[in-house]
Amino acid sequence: MRQLYQATSRSTRLAGSKGFTLIELLIVIAIIAILASLAIPQYLKYQRKAKVSSYAEPIARGCMLDIVAFCTENPGASVTTASLANCSLTTVSTAGGPVTLSANGGTCQSDGQADSAASATATLSGVTDYTAVCNYTNQSIKCTIKG
């Protein structure tokens, strides 16, 4: 019996073991699951931010452009955002869903520049953690995605 065991053992060593054990496969699957659990939430977060950037930010920027144009044409006037084409709608339909816009035009400066307090904020429906905010600073419009 002992000779049979030694012969079997020797042939196994000579042939070499091929393949993976069940434990090795389970460890690899566990590592992949851990990596996926970390990566998927980050991907979804990035996807929501991209939607706000694509759908809400252009609406806020358009409103700010109207405010700047109004101030260029009407120096010293008080801006009524409801009378501006791109600021008049508080909810705009987009391919990504409804976008809610709120704007503050402030008062135009006497040299035709927009007020530094002028701002437009757009929020995409269904995305609560990011908003598009456009401000007028240093004679230019700056839009950011805040979240």
Language model: regions and residue ranges:
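N-terminal leader/signal peptides at the extreme start of proteins
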Residues: 1-20
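Transmembrane alpha-helical core residues of multi-pass small-molecule transporters
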Residues: 32, 60-61
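N-terminal single-pass transmembrane signal-anchor helix
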Residues: 15-44, 48
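Aliphatic-rich helix starts adjacent to a transmembrane/signal segment
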Residues: 43-60
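Periplasmic/extracellular, small/polar-rich flexible segments of pilin-like filament-forming proteins
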Residues: 65-147
